[in-house]
Amino acid sequence: MSKVTPQPKIGFVSLGCPKNLVDSERILTELRTEGYDVVPSYDDADMVIVNTCGFIDSAVQESLEAIGEALNENGKVIVTGCLGAKEDQIREVHPKVLEITGPHSYEQVLEHVHHYVPKPKHNPFLSLVPEQGVKLTPRHYAYLKISEGCNHRCTFCIIPSMRGDLVSRPIGEVLSEAKRLVDAGVKEILVISQDTSAYGVDVKHRTGFHNGEPVKTSMVSLCEQLSKLGIWTRLHYVYPYPHVDDVIPLMAEGKILPYLDIPLQHASPRILKLMKRPGSVDRQLARIKQWREICPELTLRSTFIVGFPGETEEDFQMLLDFLKEARLDRVGCFKYSPVEGADANALPDQVPEEVKEERWNRFMQLQQQISAERLQEKVGREILVIIDEVDEEGAIGRSMADAPEIDGAVYLNGETNVKPGDILRVKVEHADEYDLWGSRV
């Protein structure tokens, strides 16, 4: 009787942003297709892959700690992802790492796995890989990555040095993936990239094909096509180019979610110039006003940095004034943190940590008040909610205004007869600074 060879087992650690998560999903899909088993513990694994983040220093530290833990617990480790672009830094701390690759180096990662843990001779797992591939998100939503890299050279960021310049995926390929996701039961697609509004710039917005039909490689064309799938489509990381105006009518018509994630970073023209970001606050406020006139339901999310080198109290006050005027719905704020390799490190007038902390607190206090007022306006109204979790106490979902993990939630106490992915009409009964409570209509 022939001896059955056990399936080779791979452990996997995925760190960082949703874009990194998509890279992890792709590697895991390839591994499963080839017959590798993916296991949740170091002890059972023949090898561990760590997909790292290297965006800010705290993320670098977390990645180095994760690599160290994998080495201590298992011993055979391959490193990939953004921090992998800095091989010397990893080798200095962890010389025993077997191999290191940069971000989106899927083929190299698989070659290294094959070298240390040879492929199984037969493939009983092929039918277990779903058509849409392995997903690390809940079944009812998925991230759709449309491009790699970035053409901007913001002084606080090192993404281009790690992930390279913009490379747009062919639009036919993107739309085919979206269709597979919908066929697999996904109810919400979150479009992600380093710069979603630049989609197609690198290929001069050339015409691609989907189902035999010509489609322009652009954000607006992509949104028009995704709207035909009959699911929620949410846009993230939208740089404020003029053509962003063209997607607002699609939101007003209900074709894609009335949700725009635009990282504005600051409101002082001087600081924006130091950041190498576009800098007309008045124009931005005018656009926001115009967008809301076209699409009153529009939710605006943004992120800002306080304590950037050279930021004075006057600059910071301009930022607070902008918040008061813009009344954004969802806001993230970060204290400036030096990133190794970023141009901003060389700027004069670094802001003391205690000043950063004090400004961050003032920023958050103001935005918390604005957020509470914006949510209070929804009390008494009916909204659509997609369910994320259900337990014996009730259900937790999100409105069209809430992206997973970064925004608020809608709590439906006592609502147990639903399942994740269901979309309900809900009457809002209560609101606090970030979340809503309501009951099914």
From Swiss-Prot:
Mutant lacking the gene: phenotype: Mutant shows a lack of methylthiolation of protein uS12 and a decrease in transcription of a subset of genes.
EC number(s) on file: 2.8.4.4
Keyword S-adenosyl-L-methionine tagged: yes
CDD domains recorded: Radical_SAM
Boundaries of every TRAM domain copy: 376-441
Residues that bind [4Fe-4S] cluster 1: 17, 53, 82
One term under GO cellular component: cytosol
GO BP term, example: tRNA modification
Positions bound to [4Fe-4S] cluster 2: 150, 154, 157
Record keywords: 4Fe-4S, Cytoplasm, Iron, Iron-sulfur, Metal-binding, S-adenosyl-L-methionine, Transferase
Radical SAM core domain: residues covered: 136-373
Gene Ontology MF terms in the entry: 4 iron, 4 sulfur cluster binding; aspartic acid methylthiotransferase activity; metal ion binding; protein methylthiotransferase activity
Family: Belongs to the methylthiotransferase family. RimO subfamily.
Protein's name in the database: Ribosomal protein uS12 methylthiotransferase RimO
Organism: Escherichia coli (strain K12)
Organism ancestry: Bacteria, Pseudomonadati, Pseudomonadota, Gammaproteobacteria, Enterobacterales
The gene coding this protein: rimO
